[in-house]
Amino acid sequence: MVGLCACNPWEQPEEEKDIPLAIFKTFWEQMDKHYTCFEEHFVNWDSIYYTNISQVNELQNTEDLVPIFQSILNTLKDPQLWIGVPQKASIQYRLNGSLESHGITTAKGTDFFIDNKNNEYLPSHQIYTLRLSHKCEDREFHFAYVSALSFRNKNATIYKPLLEQVAQLQPDGIIVDLRYNNKGEFPTMIEFVRQFYEGNRPILYTVQRESEENRYNMTHPEPYSIDGEGTVPDSIPIIVIVNFLTFGPANVCAYILQALPNTTVIGQTTTSGGGSSVSGVSLTHNWALHFSNDVKYYVNWHCCESPLHLNVLVSESSAIYEEYIIDGHKEVLFIDSSIATAINLLESMIPWKTSPLGIFNATGRLVE
């Protein structure tokens, strides 16, 4: 997607026909010197040059560079890459898809989750109680739902008291929904994840380039350790839900939580990104480039720029209806398939006294 101002930022004097070539060469050279994720994105950077240079040589206007740069950025699939003319035009890899409504509603159509429409950037949470039965045993099942809608800096102080409130209610499990996270900042995401563990632990490893001459010569991994606050006891099972809209800090958040005890990540494959630091350089003729200047790895040695490796794959969310006993009352609920899977997984972790191992649905029926 390319935004243009009313005055064409690529307009140039007729005699300066070599400008597109100069911009392309400068772009390629700066990426070759500084970019760190060629291997992670399976891109042969020399091939990118030789594939495009003939076409660039024939260009008459800088505007004609747009589809070439867009194709290159789409190949790299790195949302942190940006090239353009500051304040005038930009070219960037953009995610496809639109936000969808999600959650649980009653059959009557009333909202069962906290309404987020007027609170777009703030987290929401709710506690649900389901009554489960099997043989001679009845028990209540409490689960918490936490939707981390944003990791913007203004939310940095919100998550701890919210999770303290959740933990005080001692739920049987917590569902953390990252599917609709509106990006944000790395420090706010870290403030969120450190509530789920206690003590000092490495959560990421950073690798940088050792020189500009060799794009594949990298430093030894340096651990990035953060003290956890342990607001949520690690004895509480956590189900994290993600999908293709989960990228940037939310993707990193899911990876870090996945490495903690008692955590399962479900849903659809994430888009990636979010862990690497970003730098910018000036190109020629007022063009600029922003890029990732390091590579971060999780404790399982998966790259932050890679889509998350799911524990449980759930087909794209679809509407299903199930009958639940909630606070002693029977209700028919609409639940998307990812949340339904999360509930079933949490139910399977309940220490039933009389039942064999298995997964129970909300009415206590054993799922073979």
Pin down the residues of each PLM region:
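C-terminal "post-core" interaction segments
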Residues: 8-25, 144, 173, 182-368
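Sec-dependent bacterial lipoprotein signal peptides
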Residues: 1-5
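Flexible, low-complexity junctional segments that flank or bridge functional domains
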Residues: 6-208, 216-218, 348
